[in-house]
């Protein structure tokens, strides 16, 4: 509610019919003013005027007080309508509203006074269908019908069935003009028909609380048989709706008023809105169709006796009460809370403010928009040629429909052809369709014919027809080609004929040339010879060829010089060649120059472009390099464009050269310049599908992109547009993509957007718009690459502390074993294996070591350990999915581990730990392992390999229990491994034992008498151990902050160089006597080991993986390293080296708060959309007992989203891999998704953080559910 105005009058009122209505008020009869003033006034108020300052625009005193006022619609002769007043003395007076407003003279505006009533006139109403007809009612049951056009004697509607003492309310039917209703103190409502001049219906109601005394009546705005009545009886304050087709009982009974109802008004603009007021000082809003109360407005201090909507502004209504106020307010409540209005801290100011501030506000039980704010039906064009329409069904519910809207099917046909051509990479169909259709102009026709020829013949033969069919040019003064008449005439006495014959022989081949053999006697010197000839002969006979050639050139004997130069050095040849071209400057010599130098630059730059075909043929003949060929062809095209001649001919010849020279930018610039002209011709053509400039623009752009894509296809050009002049092309492509997307061709638009450079302006927004409109995301399908056995890393020497670590199988001091070959070896992150400076590894005795390749995550291998459980657990296996039993084979026996705590109590003490349960799958029956034989250890002092087994024959002291549930786990987050992402063995099948001590901290060799039998070894392949709760091993990295949630790398195993690095929660092992300040201790981590005599049970047993088992421990030597020393080197403790101090790296605070998803980059959006969709899909399906795991998974996935939103932690490679995981998940290819997730943990262990386990669980739960 917004309180618009408040008028200090104890008055009845009437609204004008204007959009910004005036309000007429008249002092109400029967009320006592607070000042005991007995005067009566008629006022006009402009409540929407900002200048009136709460004063009426007109006010005049009248002799008597009013019971009611009515303001008619404008009708003939009354442009502002008539204002009628019902006085307490029985007079009905009429005023012309327009005259009253303009003259402000009450007497001048008065048009009639009716005195037909014998007592007070209590009510009156104008007919909504016949604006000049008025009905009045008053005491003694009198009802009169007035014709305000003629003001003749009023008529009566007929005889009442049961006369009443007083008529208090009359109302006209809004649909049928001769029907009205009346109500009074008789307790009933009468329905009158003026045509039959009688009362036709009689409505009354007796309820459980008594008989209703109908005091007011109102008709349905549009339905002629429905009306509503209200009772002013305090014992039965009801509002009743009636349908006259069943007048025996009301349709709806609405209760809410605590005392009698005095006024009703049914909104003419919305049948679902009714306002009422009454003796309980309240004003209420109802939905009479549903019979429910919508809300209640602030109460008044006395009876609210009259309320009414403004006829032309139904959002506004007024309520008059006996407390001397008329409140004008709006239906909607937009006022601020009272607490914001009264905000003073001072007590005195508070009471002053609260006494002058409205502290009441309306209370709405049901929120309902009025009809004028509703849109019963709407329609809108959407991006992508979509038409969205909204309409209501019979129940009033909105129905939204989205339909395809195509205005021009001709355009759709061309876009479909383009789409098919892209899919098949065959644009020949487009060329054929263009050649078969009608061309706009000859230029366009020539382009497509040229593209057809280029498609059919290729660029190599593009000029054959032109050159072969043209006449060869002739040199001035030269006759036609001479025939070869024999060897003696091969060389003539003239230089020109010599070169002609030389060229002829070159052209015809030398196979028919007769070799010259000198015959007969001759003299070397002759008296007739000149001195120059004699000198030349001497030089030749002395084989002084250089001087001989120079002598020939001095004597202008060019032919002789050429003969001498044939078998001479390149310098001599070049000297003779230059001398020839300096003396000959004719056309043939220029051509010979280009041919002899194997360079057509002179021809391309200076030859007459009228012979452009011959120039093009020379380029094809002499330019073997592709780049040089394209450059010369483009240069020739430029010369043709700049030359004189017919414009169309030049253009076509230049395009031919550009097409041959791959000058796409040059071709496109010509086609783009011609677009406006083509659009004009299309508009002037008789093509039915071209009716607007936008149609012509689309058709011209379509023709352009078809030419471009066809040429690219013919020339085998793929990928994005490249080059310095691609901007105009890209703009045209982007515009065309926008247009075809507007026609709903999203796939075609995306194809064209892929041709644009990724950094092109406007590409990102256009692509986002198309993706949102199509409701799809583009995720490039990735392939999982694997390395074969031949690509495995080579084993390195254990003594090399900085060598590349390699996966090895565990080895014992007696010999090695062989593992099943694998097809996939996950890459290893050397950074995670590197030892820090200042903490070197001592020489290690390393017995026989055999490399064990990592297991292929896509191939299930059989176990070869007889003591391995029937269903060995893989660190990345799905605990929700039933496992496939593996075949077992008998091998050498192993010594069993010591017995642990009972299973049940162990489970209870570790309930609620971080790992996923294994209870979604049916439990498989365990297999009994083969019996084992115990063999003594040949080297009791050497470290042995501890393995898991179902039973243990030896007896050992009880091990420490897992941490209790009551202890907070926040202190040991870093000691709990949620995944073995950093381990170089993470893709191998894991053997585990529920009762084995943690790896890396197993007990030292026991003293005699403690164990019944020493441990034994086996040659069977044993997968590397893994303990999810073992202390974390992390490589020191000064550039990356430590993440307490990151999955720590597992401890080393024999045969692998492992650094000994202190972690934030693990005390560093002491080396010798050197001591360093250790980080805070982890209450659940094993205590630091002793280099001299480690205690057998120094470390407690961590909690097992829920639903899984704990991996067996690796051996621990008595030295500081867990690895045995290499052979030949005594096992002595090395010099103590202090471990490096922990490097602290301050983490930068995130750029955006957690939960914000508005800044996720475009390349990461597919990950967010895909994982969110999958997460929302499986969360409702998670059983209640695993709800905690679902919540943890959701939290971790959202942490991944936070990293994506802040563009931190994750590299581009990780994001690309995550996209592939999402693609596999959407395709329900869970093995591939799991393998890809493993690769992320392997290749980017420093980026996995605390989100990686969430993705792992999401894959597992998606597969199980």
Curated annotation (Swiss-Prot):
Molecular function terms from GO: structural molecule activity
Gene Ontology CC entries for this record: COPII vesicle coat; endoplasmic reticulum exit site; endoplasmic reticulum membrane
InterPro entries: SEC31-like, WD40/YVTN_repeat-like_dom_sf, WD40_repeat_dom_sf, WD40_rpt
Keywords: Cytoplasmic vesicle, Endoplasmic reticulum, ER-Golgi transport, Membrane, Protein transport, Repeat, Transport, WD repeat
Stretches forming WD repeats: 5-46, 61-105, 116-156, 162-202, 209-252, 256-296, 299-339, 380-403
Taxonomic superkingdom: Eukaryota
Bilayer disposition of the protein: Peripheral membrane protein
Biased composition (Polar residues): 861-878, 968-993
Biased composition (Low complexity): 927-936, 1129-1142
Biased composition (Pro residues): 1080-1089
Biased composition (Basic and acidic residues): 473-486
Record's subcellular location: Cytoplasmic vesicle, COPII-coated vesicle membrane; Endoplasmic reticulum membrane
UniProt xrefs under SUPFAM superfamilies: WD40 repeat-like (SSF50978)
Assigned protein family: Belongs to the WD repeat SEC31 family.
Name of the protein in question: Protein transport protein SEC31
């Amino acid at each position: 509610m917004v309180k618009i105005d408040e008028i200090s009058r104890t008055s009845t009122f009437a609204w004008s019919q204007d959009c910004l209505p005036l309000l007429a008020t008249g002092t109400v009869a029967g009320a006592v003013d607070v000042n005991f003033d007995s005067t009566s006034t008629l006022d006009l108020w402009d409540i929407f005027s900002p200048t009136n300052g709460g004063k009426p625009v007109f006010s005049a005193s009248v002799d008597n007080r009013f019971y009611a006022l009515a303001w008619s619609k404008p009708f003939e002769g009354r442009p502002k309508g008539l204002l009628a007043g019902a006085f307490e003395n029985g007079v009905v007076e009429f005023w012309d509203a327009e005259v009253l407003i303009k003259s402000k003279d009450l007497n001048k505006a008065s048009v009639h006074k009716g005195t037909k009533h014998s007592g007070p006139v209590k009510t009156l109403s104008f007919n909504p269908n016949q604006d000049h007809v008025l009905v009045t009612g008053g005491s003694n049951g009198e009802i009169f019908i007035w014709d305000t056009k003629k003001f003749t004697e009023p008529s009566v509607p007929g005889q009442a069935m049961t006369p009443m003492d007083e008529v208090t309310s009359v109302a006209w039917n809004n649909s049928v003009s001769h029907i009205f209703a009346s109500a009074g103190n008789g307790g009933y409502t009468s329905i009158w028909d003026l045509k039959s001049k009688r009362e036709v219906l009689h409505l009354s109601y007796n309820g459980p609380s008594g008989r209703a005394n109908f005091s007011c009546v109102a008709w349905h705005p549009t339905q002629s048989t429905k009306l509503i009545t209200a009772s002013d009886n305090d014992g039965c304050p009801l509002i009743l709706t009636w349908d006259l087709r069943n007048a025996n009982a009301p349709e709806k009974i609405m209760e809410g008023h605590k005392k009698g109802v005095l006024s009703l008004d049914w909104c003419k603009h919305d049948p679902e809105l009714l306002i009422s007021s009454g003796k309980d000082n309240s004003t209420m809003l109802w939905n009479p169709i549903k019979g429910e109360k919508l809300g209640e407005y602030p109460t008044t201090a006395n009876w609210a006796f009259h309320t009414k909507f403004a006829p032309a502004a139904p959002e506004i209504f007024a309520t008059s009460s006996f407390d001397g106020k008329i409140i004008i307010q709006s239906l909607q409540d937009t006022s601020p809370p009272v607490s914001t209005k009264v905000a003073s801290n001072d007590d005195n100011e508070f009471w002053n403010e609260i006494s002058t501030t409205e502290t009441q506000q309306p209370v709405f039980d049901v929120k309902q928009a009025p009809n004028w704010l509703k849109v019963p039906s709407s329609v809108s064009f959407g991006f992508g040629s979509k038409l969205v329409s909204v309409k209501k069904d019979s129940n009033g519910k909105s129905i939204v429909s989205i339909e395809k809207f195509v205005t021009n099917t001709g355009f759709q046909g061309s876009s479909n052809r383009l789409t098919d051509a892209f899919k098949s990479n065959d644009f020949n169909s487009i060329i054929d369709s263009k050649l078969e259709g009608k061309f706009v102009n000859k230029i366009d026709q020539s382009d497509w014919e040229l593209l057809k020829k280029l498609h059919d013949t290729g660029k190599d033969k593009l000029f054959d027809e032109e050159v072969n069919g043209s006449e060869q040019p002739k040199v001035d003064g030269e006759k036609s080609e001479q025939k070869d008449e024999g060897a003696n005439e091969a060389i003539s006495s003239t230089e020109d004929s010599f070169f002609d014959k030389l060229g002829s022989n070159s052209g015809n081949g030398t196979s028919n040339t007769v070799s010259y053999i000198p015959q007969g006697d001759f003299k070397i010197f002759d008296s007739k010879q000149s001195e120059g000839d004699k000198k030349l002969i001497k030089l030749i006979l002395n084989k002084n060829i250089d001087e001989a050639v120079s002598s020939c050139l001095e004597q202008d004997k060019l032919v002789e010089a050429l003969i001498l130069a044939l078998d001479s050095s390149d310098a001599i040849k070049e000297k003779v060649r230059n001398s020839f071209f300096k003396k000959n400057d004719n056309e043939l010599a220029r051509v010979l120059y280009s041919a002899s130098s194997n360079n057509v630059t002179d021809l391309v730059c200076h030859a007459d472009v009228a012979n452009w075909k011959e120039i093009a043929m020379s380029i094809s003949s002499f330019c073997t390099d592709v780049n040089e060929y394209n450059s010369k062809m483009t240069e020739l095209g430029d010369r043709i464009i700049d030359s004189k001649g017919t414009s169309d001919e030049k253009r076509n010849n230049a395009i031919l050269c550009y097409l041959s020279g791959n000058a796409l930018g040059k071709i496109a610039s010509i086609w783009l310049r011609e677009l406006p002209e083509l659009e004009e011709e299309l508009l002037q053509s008789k093509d039915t599908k071209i009716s607007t400039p936008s149609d012509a623009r689309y058709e011209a752009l379509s023709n352009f992109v078809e030419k471009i894509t066809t040429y690219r296809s013919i020339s085998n050009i793929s990928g994005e547009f490249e080059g310095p002049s691609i901007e105009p092309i890209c703009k045209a492509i982007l515009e065309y993509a926008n247009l075809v997307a507007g026609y709903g061709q999203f796939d075609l638009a995306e194809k064209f957007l892929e041709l644009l450079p990724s950094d092109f302006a406007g590409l990102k927004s256009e692509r986002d718009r198309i993706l949102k409109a199509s409701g799809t995301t583009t995720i490039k399908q990735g392939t999982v690459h694997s390395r074969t056995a031949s690509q495995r890393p080579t084993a390195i020497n254990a003594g090399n502390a900085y060598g590349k670590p390699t996966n090895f199988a565990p080895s014992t001091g007696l010999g090695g074993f062989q593992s099943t070959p694998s097809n996939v070896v996950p890459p290893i992150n050397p950074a995670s294996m590197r030892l820090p400076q200042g903490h070197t590894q001592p020489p290690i005795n390393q017995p026989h070591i055999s490399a064990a390749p990592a297991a292929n995550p896509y191939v299930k291998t059989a176990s070869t350990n007889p003591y391995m459980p029937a269903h060995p657990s893989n660190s990345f296996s799905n605990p929700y999915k039933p496992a496939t039993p593996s075949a077992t084979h008998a091998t050498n026996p192993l010594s069993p581990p010591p017995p642990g705590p009972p299973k049940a109590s162990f489970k209870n003490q570790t309930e609620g730990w971080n790992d996923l349960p294994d209870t979604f799958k049916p439990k498989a029956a365990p297999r009994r392992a083969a019996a084992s034989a115990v063999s003594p250890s040949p080297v009791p002092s050497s470290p042995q390999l501890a393995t898991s087994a179902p039973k243990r024959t030896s007896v050992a002291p009880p091990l420490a229990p897992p941490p209790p549930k009551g202890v907070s786990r926040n202190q040991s987050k870093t000691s709990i491994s949620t995944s073995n992402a950093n381990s170089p063995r993470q893709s191998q099948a894991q053997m585990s034992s529920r009762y084995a001590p943690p790896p890396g901290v197993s007990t030292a060799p026991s003293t005699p008498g403690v164990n019944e039998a020493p441990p034994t070894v086996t040659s069977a392949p044993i997968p590397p151990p893994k303990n999810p709760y073992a202390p974390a091993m992390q490589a020191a990295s000064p550039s990356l902050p430590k993440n307490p949630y990151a999955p720590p790398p597992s401890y080393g195993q024999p045969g692998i160089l492992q650094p000994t690095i202190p972690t934030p929660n693990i005390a560093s092992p002491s080396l010798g006597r050197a001591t360093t300040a250790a980080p805070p201790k982890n209450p659940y981590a094993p205590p630091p080991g002793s280099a001299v005599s480690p205690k057998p049970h120094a470390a407690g047993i961590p909690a097992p993986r829920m639903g899984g088992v704990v991996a067996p421990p690796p051996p621990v030597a008595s030295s500081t390293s867990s690895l045995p020393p290499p052979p030949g080197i005594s096992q002595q403790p090395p010099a103590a080296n202090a471990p490096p101090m922990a490097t602290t790296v301050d983490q930068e605070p995130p750029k955006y708060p957690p939960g914000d998803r508005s800044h996720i980059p475009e390349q990461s959006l597919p990950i967010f959309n895909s994982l969110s969709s999958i997460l929302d899909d499986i969360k409702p399906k998670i059983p209640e007992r695993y709800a905690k795991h679902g919540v943890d998974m959701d939290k971790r996935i959202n942490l991944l989203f936070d990293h994506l939103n802040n563009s931190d932690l994750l590299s581009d490679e990780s994001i690309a891999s995550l996209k592939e995981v999402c693609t596999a998940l959407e395709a329900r290819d869970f093995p591939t998704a799991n393998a890809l997730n493993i690769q992320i943990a392997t290749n980017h262990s420093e980026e996995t953080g605390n989100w990686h386990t969430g993705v792992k669980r999401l894959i597992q739960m998606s597969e199980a559910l």
